[in-house]
């Protein structure tokens, strides 16, 4: 899995603070910008975050380049609707050679027997795909035999408000392992450019009781420590 923060709103925290300040100011935008110091930005962000005034977070957006995730993971990712996605097409991109890039779950690679079962199934899919393409079947139809394990590439843009929501769900221990790893790395990247906005971002247990109720992982203290100590 490879994840890069391709671009983001210039000075995202200042943009959010300016938008929030405007809501309560009678002066013009130019004057607000001149008066908004770095310490003011941090203080104002602290205040609006504590008040739950999250609509202003939508003024900051972040674009990620993601490679080497499975179609199983990308299907979960695109369920987050307040975002923009551009994904490598299996309709227009034809896999060449005897196989296709794929993601192997750790539970599968744990034993030789499981790996053999998995690779046998993957090779059967690859052989069927190649036979169909060689027989003149369009890639858009031959792709029907490709599995969820097939790797994909996708560019994703989300605003800060949606990212916080995304992290709350997908950084949770109960999230599927692949999208959890994706979400944790995305969080690490945005913390590097907007540390105040994303200071408390992560699974729901960081800021209150576990929202999973009876399905809790039971490791809230450990999870909190890991996210508080996250390196950026």
Swiss-Prot record:
Where, by residue number, is the active site? 170
SUPFAM superfamilies in the record, alphabetically? Answer: Thymidylate synthase-complementing protein Thy1
Query: Which reaction(s) does the protein catalyse, per the Swiss-Prot or TrEMBL entry?
Result: dUMP + (6R)-5,10-methylene-5,6,7,8-tetrahydrofolate + NADPH + H(+) = dTMP + (6S)-5,6,7,8-tetrahydrofolate + NADP(+)
Per its UniProt record, what Pfam families does this chain match? Answer: Thy1
Which cysteine-cysteine pairs are annotated as disulfide bonds in the entry? none
Keywords tagged on the record: FAD, Flavoprotein, Methyltransferase, NADP, Nucleotide biosynthesis, Transferase
Q: What class of enzyme is it?
A: transferase
Signal peptide (UniProt feature, chain positions): none
Q: What does this protein's record comment on cofactor binding?
A: Binds 4 FAD per tetramer. Each FAD binding site is formed by three monomers.
Pathway it works in:
Pyrimidine metabolism; dTTP biosynthesis
Q: Which residues form the ThyX domain?
A: 1-204
Q: Which GO terms describe its molecular function?
A: flavin adenine dinucleotide binding; NADPH binding; thymidylate synthase (FAD) activity; thymidylate synthase activity
| Annotated dUMP binding sites | 76-79, 87-91, 143, 170
Q: Where is motif ThyX motif found?
A: 79-89
Q: Which InterPro entries match?
A: Thymidylate_synthase_ThyX, Thymidylate_synthase_ThyX_sf
Needed cofactors, names only, are: FAD
Binding residues annotated for FAD, in chain numbering? 55, 79-81, 87, 159-161, 165
Supply the EC number(s): 2.1.1.148
Source organism's superkingdom?
Bacteria
Annotated GO biological processes are: dTMP biosynthetic process; dTTP biosynthetic process; methylation
Q: What does this protein do?
A: Catalyzes the reductive methylation of 2'-deoxyuridine-5'-monophosphate (dUMP) to 2'-deoxythymidine-5'-monophosphate (dTMP) while utilizing 5,10-methylenetetrahydrofolate (mTHF) as the methyl donor, and NADPH and FADH(2) as the reductant.
Q: How does it assemble?
A: Homotetramer.
Q: Which family does it belong to?
A: Belongs to the thymidylate synthase ThyX family.
Q: Which PANTHER family match?
A: FLAVIN-DEPENDENT THYMIDYLATE SYNTHASE
- Official protein name in the record: Flavin-dependent thymidylate synthase
């Amino acid at each position: 899995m490879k994840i890069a923060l391709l671009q983001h709103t210039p000075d995202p925290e200042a943009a959010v603070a300016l938008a929030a300040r405007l809501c309560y100011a009678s002066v013009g935008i130019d004057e607000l910008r001149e008066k908004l110091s770095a310490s003011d930005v941090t203080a104002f962000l602290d205040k609006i975050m504590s008040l739950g005034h999250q609509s202003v977070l939508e003024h900051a957006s972040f674009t990620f380049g993601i490679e080497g995730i499975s179609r199983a993971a990308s299907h979960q990712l695109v369920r987050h609707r307040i975002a923009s996605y551009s994904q490598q097409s299996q309709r227009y991109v034809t896999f060449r050679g005897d196989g296709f890039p794929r993601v192997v779950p750790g539970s599968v690679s744990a034993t030789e027997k499981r790996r053999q079962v998995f690779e046998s199934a993957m090779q059967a899919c690859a052989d069927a795909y190649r036979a169909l393409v060689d027989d003149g079947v369009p890639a858009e139809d031959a792709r029907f035999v490709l599995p969820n394990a097939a790797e994909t590439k996708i560019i994703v843009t989300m605003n800060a408000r949606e990212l916080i929501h995304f992290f709350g769900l997908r950084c949770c221990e109960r999230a599927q392992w692949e999208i959890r790893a994706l979400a944790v790395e995305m969080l690490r990247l945005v913390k590097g450019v907007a540390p105040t906005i994303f200071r408390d971002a992560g699974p729901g247990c960081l800021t209150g009781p576990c929202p999973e109720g009876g399905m809790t992982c039971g490791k809230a203290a450990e999870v909190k420590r890991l996210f508080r100590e996250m390196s950026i």
